[in-house]
Structures are given as structure tokens and as C-alpha cells.
């Protein structure tokens, strides 16, 4: 079995494989940019992730937030995200990636996706055109006295939104991940942009079911999956939820912390 999981480059690798299921798929690259605080005193004052609401007509992925994170063991303060544009499919990819991915088989999908997502296209153009001062103005909705000298813009990463065929619109822009599998199950490809690590387990379970159905759909296979993920394909009652929450907290060392928060 061949599994293609190369982030933004998955599309380019998939297009080299001779399977019918790849036809009609395209990708649109979007870079993620953040304002990163350089003032350690300000960083020390913030201890949470604070969300606002997306602007009127803006996509869900644009929800701005002020976020404390630990990067390489060091506490940091970020604000964003802001969308940028680069034709690269990876942060260190080639400027030709987008153009290499376009073919006669996916042009209708891509044109249809853009035509039916004009508000998103307009949003991305506005984001790319934003100056540093414009971004600081957005930040001041969270921190009124934010100073430009305390912040800098950093390109965090690159993602590729999946574009696929649609019978009604010609093409459709996907905001999640997509698992593509050949009919014989010998090739599986993971494409798209995941909202975070919380979805990783579900995605890989989907991959396993498509790649190895003859193993997964057996009594032994189901037993092994239930050992690893007790709530997999189980109706989640309050009792089962609390039981597994407790196990997770113990494994992560969070149980005592939650008890202290409740008592306070």
C-alpha cells in the first residue's frame, strides 16, 4: 500500500499516479501570517487564547484571536491569523507549484470553485493588501494601546485548500481534509487543510478503513481499534464520556489541575 501524506505537496504527488480518482482535484495555496510580540513584559501579562468573531462575510478560518503559545519551550504571544498568498504548496516549496498543478482535468473544477466563492476571493485580496499598520489596527481591538515597535509579522506556514469537482457548481472549495483512495485500495492520499491536531486521529482512522478494509473489518481488527480508541463508533453517553475523559486527564497529568480549578 502507498500512502501519500506530504502536506501541500500531496496534490502534486497524487497527479503522478495513474488512478481515475485523482481527476478533477486541484489546490489553492494560502499562507498563514501572525503578528508576534517582541516585548517580554507584554507576553507575561497574557495567559489565554481569546477569540473574537469573523467579520461580516468573512470565512470561518478568519476568526481573529490573541493566543499564548509555547514555541521551542519559550512562551510567545501571537495575534491573527492573517491570510497571505504564495504560489508555493509548502513553506519552502517552489513558486511554480500552483502552475504545475493546473491541468485540463482540473481547470473546470478550479474555475467553478472561484466563481462560486467570490466573497472568499475578495477577502483574500483584502488580506494580502493589508499593511502592517492595518494589522496593528485589528490588534488594537484586543489591546488598545498596542505599539508597532512591540510587534512583527511572521509567516507561520502554508496550507493548500482542496478543490474538487461538483456536479452543480463545476468545482467546490473544501475547508477540511479529503481522503482519496483508489478502487483497489492500494493508494490513499490525504489532502486539504486540517483545523488542528484534534482531527488527526479521526483522519487516520478513515485512511486505515480505506487502505486496509480486509484487516479493519474483522473481529480482531475491531478489537484492536477499540483498545486504542474506546469511543470509536460508540454511542457516547454521559457515563462513557466521563470515564474516558478521566483516563485522558490521568494520561496527560491534567486531573489534579482541573480539580484545583473547580475548587477555586
Identify what each model region corresponds to.
Residues 1-122, 127-155, 171-173, 180-182, ...:
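Active-site substrate-recognition segment that forms the wall
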Residues 148, 152-264:
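C-terminal lid/capping helical subdomain adjacent to the catalytic/cofactor pocket in oxidative enzymes
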